């Protein structure tokens, strides 16, 4: 019989096994081709070129995506080869050489790859338009997205999947040449671990795994404390090592120990539900520990990165407001022309004028006593003051007397990393003038432009009018003296006002610093700053969400494939149980528990990993934690639930067919 006939007969016979592997290939090609096609879409490129890191971001995401695809396909191929191990053993028994078997399977793989690449590229071509529309929606760009076929994306994908095919063929050849004939017949049915009595050492190691995870979580909450900031990199390595190592020990020892304890408490009186749930988990935990650890860590990392990116995107409005606390900001009396144009166009607005006066102070003096050894405590900088009467225009209830001050405009990551305390005295100076402020309250309300506060988030002192008048004797030492905040009464006027703001050059400010040098600054409008934030963060949130989806689909599919493989291995056991009288619903109760563990435990631990990772440094990315975190987590829970339902459905099919 010729090789071609053998290939056709083999593929026809193994059709029920191939669809799983074939789906993995098609899914991988679709993901990769749609993403590289997206990079070469002219409408998309025109929208993202405003971001200086667009090219680097797309390239980095492409490499990560290729790693995901490589990992996914190699794992699927490994499961596929394991399920065909008996067939490969039979080929050797009838006299076929290992070289001939390798050629036979190589031809099958090549045919599968060619078919998967063609179908995957077609699916990727059509799905790329959907992804392009999503990206433009995230960027708030209006553009007509056309179906664009990129020859560059085609060539890149063909090269990548040719390399992947070569790697798969090497993996397959290695497995055939390095596995004994006897092991081929037992590979699909051998128990992973014989359950023995647990030793005290195993119990200690299992408990140690839990302690390591808890310590990693605790250390993550202290990661950005001032006391540990100097050893940030070392602390991050320790946290990674303890959480990943602890996760492995939990899966390798803790889970099996807990299951064995439950079994022993029943004193041998195990129900069919216990047999089908507890026993398989215990037997397979040795080999599953590595894969479950990897899946858990990948879930935590992908969810954490996706959540942090979403926090940054979600907080783009708050971030813009911290730098531009009003629809428009006019500095140093240089926006009169803009106000005239607003009145000419009958655009109604509210106006608040703030007088500004700089002082020199070391705000670190407001830190807690345990932090006063930190070098930041003695660093002096320019901080601006505003009179109470101006502040009361936006906060009418504010009250001060004597040397009392309110510290406001202080929030975001600055307030999280360097928390300040009220009821402290602070010595400030302005030229030869020196005053002692008593801070009675700290507000996070933004009132002054980020240009004045050196980037936004910097503090502002609200002082009594008498104190402010005294400080203005040193006005010549500081560049900023006046700010006008404009808030439009109708959002419908924003687009027109934006054009007038640009036409009047109201955002171009010239100021003279304390050294007599003239500098030019560009003050954005709130809407302009918000759109800049979205343009710079939109691509990041899209690529991280895309990669997060790829990671999630990969880990979920691997769990699903693994459960399908285990279901086939346990088919004979279900046949015996059905023949001795157990109903389908009795068997399915144990399977429900088993699937709840296989999908639920990695998901729960992964969610905990991502929660503590995000909680440790979310304030560096935005101002809102709860909503983005819950939205991202719910998406992950929903998709994992779908995979669990599919897995249960497959088990139900196997149980029904077992008789």
Regions found by a protein language model. Give the residues of each.
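Short helix-loop junctions at transmembrane helix boundaries
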Residues: 37-47, 51, 116, 121-153, ...
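Short cytosolic juxtamembrane segments of multi-pass membrane proteins
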Residues: 1, 5, 178-195, 568-569, ...
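Basic-flanked hydrophobic alpha-helices used for secretion and membrane insertion
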Residues: 326-331, 337-553
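Hydrophobic alpha-helical segments
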Residues: 112-260
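N-terminal Sec/SRP start-transfer signal
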Residues: 1-29, 194-197, 250-296
